Amino acid sequence: YDDKNGINTTIKDGVTLGDPVGTKVYEDGLNNSATTENSLLKSLGITNPNNDAYTVSFDKTITTTTEKSNGQTITYSYNESGTILTAKRTDEKTVFTVELKKDASGKDVYDFQLKEAMDHEYGNNGKNDFDLPFKFNVTSNGMTSDNKTFNVTVVDSVPNAKDKTVTTNEDT
C-alpha cells in the first residue's frame, strides 16, 4: 500500500525456473520391450504460482552432439514449436527423442526415449556412461528466459563377466 497516493499494488511472481531433475537411461532396456528403463519422465523444475500463460521450448540452435551411434554422427531436429527433439543418425535411424510436455498432474516434464544404442569409449577407468545435455527456456508475457540445462546420463549395456554353468544335450 502506498500511503502517499493511496494506491494498493500487488506484486505477482511469474513463472520461475528451478533446477531440472537429471536422469539415467540404460541401454540394457533396448533389449527388452517390457522394461521402461530407457524411457523416463523427469521434472523440468518450473513453478507457476499465478497460472500465467507460458511456453517451454528447446534451444533450437543446438543441432548436433559429439556422441555417436553405430559410428555415425547424430543430428538434432525439432518440431515447429520446439517441444520435441529428434536425434537421428546419418542413416536416418532415430537414436532418441526428447519431448517437453505436461504430465498427468499438469507439471512440466521431459520425456526421454532411447531407441538405439549409442557408442561408448571403453577403458575410461570403468566409466561406461556419458551425459547428454539439453537446453530449454520459458517464454511468458513476451519475455524469454535464459536457457536452463538438464542432463540425461546414458549408461552402456556392459555384459557381466561371471562363471556360468551350461548344459547341452547332444545326439547319441
Predicted regions mapped to residue ranges:
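Acidic/polar, solvent-exposed loop/turn segments
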Residues: 1-172
